[in-house]
Amino acid sequence: MLLILSSAKTLVFDDAFTVPKITEPIFKKEGEFLVDLLQKFSEKDLEKLLKVSESLANLNYQRFQSFNTSEKQASILAYRGDVFKQLQLNKFNKNDYLFAQNHVRIISGLYGILRPLDQISPYRLEMNTCLKTENNDNLYQFWEEKVTEKLNNELEQHNNQVLLNLASDEYSRMIKNEKFNYPIFKVSFKEMRNGKLKTIGIIAKKSRGLMTNWIIENKIDDSSKLKDYNGLGYHYDDSLSNEKEMVFIK
């Protein structure tokens, strides 16, 4: 079983935690190609491309210009968005990190897919950014074939050949479903609000992180055991779930 997460905009590079080893991104060369393109953008151009404030555009201009010499950090440590904050890194041991390395994949606009111990540099490049290359109009077109093929090849080596989608729709769209050889289970967290079941964005993000932490700590590699998850009071609802979606409610 593999699970996918979305990369985060919030990044922290410090020495608060250590990992058992560091690996290079699978698509390092492709990421460097995109950085070469981005280094040609001015601050104003980046402000428009990334749809960010002037200060953030200036920050990321400096990041891209110094990309090759910048500090690096394992992706699982560097990302600190709402999902990644739920990973209890202070409790992780060597086996936890190595299990995550084998079972967790992070979808990234710059790197395609990352393993948790792949080292990354500071950057900002969301998946829906309309960065054009010679043969592609956007990042989806640039990455979808590469990422889909790689995930297919990786799952071929797993006993439980299932992809657990804990990423946002924006990022999971990178996978071409029609060319994916294995079942994809999307996980949804819903709760009753005003008589209707609704997904609450910030709580759903937190829940995706907590489920990921639970999977890593308990070394879950059997998709049928996912039904036992009960974080934040959620429980699996068989009547709302189907062959493509696992729904947890409270």
Swiss-Prot record:
Q: Which organism is it from?
A: Crocosphaera subtropica (strain ATCC 51142 / BH68) (Cyanothece sp. (strain ATCC 51142))
Q: Name one GO biological process term.
A: response to hydroperoxide
Which InterPro entries does the record cross-reference, listed alphabetically? YaaA (IPR005583)
From the Swiss-Prot or TrEMBL record, give the protein name: UPF0246 protein cce_3295
The family database entries (Pfam families) matched by this protein are listed as:
H2O2_YaaD
Q: Which GO terms describe its cellular component?
A: cytosol
Family label:
Belongs to the UPF0246 family.
